Regions:
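Conserved class I S-adenosyl-L-methionine
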Residues: 1-40, 54-58, 75-78, 137-164
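Class I SAM-dependent methyltransferase SAM/SAH-binding core
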Residues: 46, 52-96
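A conserved beta-strand element that flanks and buttresses the S-adenosyl-L-methionine
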Residues: 108
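Short catalytic micro-motifs in class I SAM-dependent methyltransferases
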Residues: 111-112
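A short glycine-rich, Lys/Arg-flanked "PGG" loop and its adjoining helix->strand segment in the class I
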Residues: 120-135
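Short alpha-helix
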Residues: 166-180
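Conserved small/polar residues in nucleotide/adenosyl-binding loops
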Residues: 182-184
């Protein structure tokens, strides 16, 4: 079984619970992120690793369009049930996005990077599909700088959640953005 298969299996089996949890978080996510992201209203947004659509649903009333991507069809179906007309759901891999260079004004990924075997490929894809002058927003777990503590944390997380791959320390995550010439705020 590949890591992607483990991710699909874990979230397919729990899609109903994930969707219920996601629905309860939409307002909180909206309240926390709108002041930070400050959408103007005319943006085309990509939400990578949307899960049951929490971020996509939170942003949808405040932007022109949201395209929400996930690897797990069961999660996309759950998101589709609550999605307004300006949200499009697409089954795709974060490391191989089916979009052209610079298609989006704002590209987001929330609580997804730690599930990826190759986070550097996903960050490169987020950067690739963001228009020049656009923004990339990533919200994920941050590991401590101590490598032994990271190993212990990841072992704990994998025992709790088999879809977990690894948590990156802040410096490593920033380094992935630096490699793609994106500034980190």
């Amino acid at each position: 079984m590949t890591h992607d298969d483990a991710v699909r299996a874990r979230f397919a089996a729990t899609a109903g619970r994930v969707a219920e949890h996601a629905a309860g978080q939409v307002e909180e996510v909206r309240e926390r992120l709108l002041p930070f992201l400050a959408p103007a209203g005319d943006e085309r947004v990509l939400d990578v690793g949307t899960g049951a659509g929490t971020l996509a649903l939170a942003l949808a009333p405040h932007v022109r369009e949201v395209v929400a991507v996930d690897l797990v069809p069961e999660l996309l179906e759950a998101a589709r049930a609550a999605a307004p007309e300006n949200v499009t759901l697409v089954e795709a891999d974060a490391t191989r996005l089916p979009f052209e260079y610079g298609e989006f004004d704002l590209v987001c990924s929330r609580r997804t990077i730690h599930h990826l075997a190759r986070p550097e490929l996903a960050i490169a894809e987020l950067a690739r599909v963001t228009r020049p002058g656009g923004r990339v927003f990533v919200d994920d777990q941050i590991a401590p700088a101590d490598p032994l503590a990271v190993l212990e944390l990841d072992r704990f997380e994998r025992a709790r959640d088999p879809s977990h791959h690894r948590t990156l320390p802040d410096g490593d995550l920033r380094g992935l953005f630096d490699a793609d010439r994106k500034s980190v705020v």
